[in-house]
From Swiss-Prot:
<comment type="subunit">
    <text>Homotetramer. Forms an RuvA(8)-RuvB(12)-Holliday junction (HJ) complex. HJ DNA is sandwiched between 2 RuvA tetramers; dsDNA enters through RuvA and exits via RuvB. An RuvB hexamer assembles on each DNA strand where it exits the tetramer. Each RuvB hexamer is contacted by two RuvA subunits (via domain III) on 2 adjacent RuvB subunits; this complex drives branch migration. In the full resolvosome a probable DNA-RuvA(4)-RuvB(12)-RuvC(2) complex forms which resolves the HJ.</text>
</comment>
<dbReference type="GO" id="GO:0000400">
    <property type="term" value="F:four-way junction DNA binding"/>
</dbReference>
<dbReference type="GO" id="GO:0006281">
    <property type="term" value="P:DNA repair"/>
</dbReference>
<comment type="function">
    <text>The RuvA-RuvB-RuvC complex processes Holliday junction (HJ) DNA during genetic recombination and DNA repair, while the RuvA-RuvB complex plays an important role in the rescue of blocked DNA replication forks via replication fork reversal (RFR). RuvA specifically binds to HJ cruciform DNA, conferring on it an open structure. The RuvB hexamer acts as an ATP-dependent pump, pulling dsDNA into and through the RuvAB complex. HJ branch migration allows RuvC to scan DNA until it finds its consensus sequence, where it cleaves and resolves the cruciform DNA.</text>
</comment>
<keyword id="KW-0233">DNA recombination</keyword>
<dbReference type="Pfam" id="PF14520">
    <property type="entry name" value="HHH_5"/>
</dbReference>
<comment type="similarity">
    <text>Belongs to the RuvA family.</text>
</comment>
<dbReference type="InterPro" id="IPR012340">
    <property type="entry name" value="NA-bd_OB-fold"/>
</dbReference>
<protein>
    <recommendedName>
        <fullName>Holliday junction branch migration complex subunit RuvA</fullName>
    </recommendedName>
</protein>
<dbReference type="GO" id="GO:0009379">
    <property type="term" value="C:Holliday junction helicase complex"/>
</dbReference>
<keyword id="KW-0963">Cytoplasm</keyword>
<feature type="region of interest" description="Flexible linker">
    <location>
        <begin position="143"/>
        <end position="150"/>
    </location>
</feature>
<feature type="region of interest" description="Domain III">
    <location>
        <begin position="150"/>
        <end position="199"/>
    </location>
</feature>
<dbReference type="InterPro" id="IPR003583">
    <property type="entry name" value="Hlx-hairpin-Hlx_DNA-bd_motif"/>
</dbReference>
<dbReference type="InterPro" id="IPR010994">
    <property type="entry name" value="RuvA_2-like"/>
</dbReference>
<feature type="region of interest" description="Domain II">
    <location>
        <begin position="64"/>
        <end position="142"/>
    </location>
</feature>
<keyword id="KW-0227">DNA damage</keyword>
Length: 199
């Protein structure tokens, strides 16, 4: 099992990071909370989780061990796969997710793409006890730090990032269109668009 990878960020295309580890490039899918901390050429440590299926092997990477633990905990919930777990961690900070579960806030959870009312209720029931020990987390304000994207189009980058979370193209376009006039950087557009969709 690959527990973590230490290397240099070679390329970024939300939500995937290409990490150069001693000349070998690893494609790693990350939540936006991790992705938005990375810059091309940066040396980083990503805490990883490997998912093996019949047709593919996929690495998921996280900026810290706690986020990886939360991801693995989410995967234990019936009906939650890696894509949904990644979407949850991209939309909600660890702190907000724990708070949401502790306070039975179904309305916040159903705003995550792919999470319906039944899934949200199942998450509440199955995670309540497990999350009691996870009171500390990343603050929601710091969930999407600054990033420098390679693309010349911040709007296109933001739309692609939102679609990677599971939002429909039209939903992503509308959310980005509503906030793009106020921002010039992709990360700022993503952050504002996510906030607008969580209202």
């Amino acid at each position: 099992m690959i527990g973590c990878l230490i290397g240099e960020v070679f390329a970024l295309e939300a939500p995937t990071v290409l990490l150069n580890v001693n000349g070998v490039g690893y494609e790693i899918d990350t939540p936006l909370s991790t992705f938005c901390q990375l810059q091309k050429g940066q040396k980083v440590t990503l805490w990883t989780h490997l998912v093996v299926r019949e047709d593919a092997q996929q690495l998921y990477g996280f900026s810290d061990a706690q986020e990886k633990t939360i991801f693995r905990t989410l995967l234990k919930v019936n009906g939650v796969g890696p894509k949904m777990a990644l979407g949850i961690l991209s939309t909600l900070s660890v702190e907000l997710l724990v708070h949401t579960i502790e306070h039975d806030d179904v309305n916040t959870l159903v705003k995550v793409p792919g999470v319906g009312k039944k899934t949200a209720e199942r998450l509440m029931i199955e995670l309540r006890d497990r999350f009691k020990t996870l009171a500390q987390g990343t603050s929601s304000a710091a969930a999407l730090p600054q990033i420098q994207f390679v693309s010349n189009s911040p709007v296109a980058e933001a739309e692609a990032a939102l679609q990677s979370l599971g939002y429909k193209p039209l939903e992503a376009q509308k959310a980005v269109a509503a906030v793009k006039a106020d921002y010039t950087e992709s990360a700022d557009i993503i952050r504002a668009a996510l906030k607008s969709m969580m209202k």
